[in-house]
């Protein structure tokens, strides 16, 4: 007899892995622009850098081809937190990473021994959202752990609690008055809300 466990949704980049650190490293190497984390005040690097979208696409293509995704380090406390959470919840990882790097993502998850029950990739360029992935798969979420404010707002509108890892790129929406949005500095604080 299986015991029902509620589900929580979790993003990869900015929540489980410190992808921004790797992206900034290669922005400096490939584009010659030095960015600090506090400089990244928008989720889209091309807006932060003031460069054409096409130039950023070439950057991402190079990141993909050189498998730089595998260099991303786990955020402090993430692995321990997921180990703890798996006892109480179904872990649903939903990422907006492109599907063409699915194998790299799965390799990264395996290499880092990240526990999860289900993994979904959304195709944002085709109008998919993390919320639509949840709704179309009839997943009843207790909460979602995220770093992108636009995805967080989608969940809040549906009455789903969001634990938002606080970064400069998600502070653009200043006046969000919702008990469903909880900003945290890291995993230890996030766990106190679960």
Residue ranges and their predicted role:
Residues 98-145, 149-154, 158:
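Substrate-recognition "cap/lid" segment bordering the active-site pocket of phosphatases
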Residues 127-132, 171-179, 192-194:
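Short, charged, surface-exposed secondary-structure boundary motifs
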Residues 120-123, 179-189:
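Short acidic-hydrophobic, aromatic-tinged amphipathic segments that line or gate anion-handling sites
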Residues 46-80:
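Metal-dependent phosphoesterase signature
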Residues 1-58:
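Active-site neighborhood of HAD-like aspartate-dependent phosphohydrolases
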Residues 144-185:
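Acidic, Mg2+-coordinating phosphoryl-transfer loop and its flanking beta/alpha structural elements
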Residues 69, 78-108, 120-122:
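Substrate-recognition element of Asp-dependent hydrolases with the DxDx(T/V) motif
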């Amino acid at each position: 007899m299986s015991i029902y466990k509620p589900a929580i949704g979790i993003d990869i980049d900015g929540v489980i892995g410190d992808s921004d650190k790797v992206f900034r490293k290669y922005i400096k190497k490939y584009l010659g622009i030095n960015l600090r984390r506090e400089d990244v005040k928008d989720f889209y690097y091309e807006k932060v850098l003031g460069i054409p979208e096409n130039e950023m696409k070439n950057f991402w293509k190079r990141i993909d081809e050189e498998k730089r995704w595998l260099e991303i380090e786990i955020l402090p406390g993430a692995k321990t937190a997921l180990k703890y959470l798996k006892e109480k919840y179904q872990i649903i990882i939903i990422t907006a990473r492109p599907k063409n790097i699915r194998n790299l993502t799965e390799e990264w998850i395996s290499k880092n021994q990240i526990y999860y029950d289900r993994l979904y990739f959304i195709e944002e360029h085709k109008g998919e959202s993390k919320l639509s992935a949840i709704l179309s798969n009839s997943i009843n979420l207790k909460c979602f752990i995220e770093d992108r404010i636009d995805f967080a707002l989608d969940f809040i509108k549906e009455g789903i609690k969001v634990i938002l890892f606080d970064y400069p790129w998600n502070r653009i929406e200043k006046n969000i008055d919702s008990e469903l949005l909880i900003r945290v500095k890291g995993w230890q604080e996030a766990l106190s809300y679960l």
